[in-house]
Regions:
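Acyl-donor (CoA/ACP) binding surface of acyl/acetyltransferases
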Residues: 1-36, 69-139
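A generic alpha-helix propensity feature with a strong bias for hydrophobic helices
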Residues: 18, 45-47, 63, 104
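Short, P/G- and charge-enriched loop/turn segments at secondary-structure junctions
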Residues: 1-2, 56-60
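Conserved GNAT-fold acetyl-CoA-binding loop/helix
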Residues: 34-56, 68-70
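Short loop/turn motifs at secondary-structure junctions and domain boundaries
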Residues: 60-66
Length: 139
């Protein structure tokens, strides 16, 4: 199944591609993002961390049909990546995301989460979505 671009009022959720690693590497390695991620994310974040994750984890899992990754972008600035949202077909953690701090507090992740959740239930026809998150990570 080809992963589609999802659109919302303000956002484009574009399927992750290898070229996104450059922008991810610029935005992601910040403690205010990484501290809320799973414990397997290394800190300090390595210089090739995004390239390694995109090419060796995310894209292969997308090809296997067990994950759906999107870069989050504003429709008005479609070349600028703001964060990532993903869905995983695993038992206890089906949705993950991060957003660069300068874009937080503006409702972007809520908008992206609604679109991804809709895709999970209405396109993939999954009966349940589990998304355990850090309670302190809220705005």
């Amino acid at each position: 199944m080809t992963i589609p671009t999802l659109t919302t009022e303000r956002l484009l959720l574009k399927p992750l591609v290898a070229e996104d690693a450059v922008q991810i590497q610029t935005l992601y390695p910040r403690w205010e993002i990484v501290r809320y991620m799973v414990s397997s994310v290394p800190w300090p974040y390595p210089d090739n961390g995004a390239e390694n994750y995109v090419n060796n984890v995310a894209l292969p899992d997308m090809a296997k049909g067990i994950a759906w990754f999107w870069s989050i972008r504003r429709r008005e600035v479609p070349d600028e990546l703001m964060g990532i949202i993903c869905l995983y077909d695993v038992e206890d953690n089906n949705r993950g995301f991060w957003l660069a701090p300068e874009f937080q507090g503006q409702g972007y992740m809520r908008e992206a989460s609604i679109a991804a959740t809709d895709y999970w239930f209405n396109t993939l026809n999954k009966p349940v979505l589990r998304a355990p998150k850090a309670a302190a990570n809220s705005r």
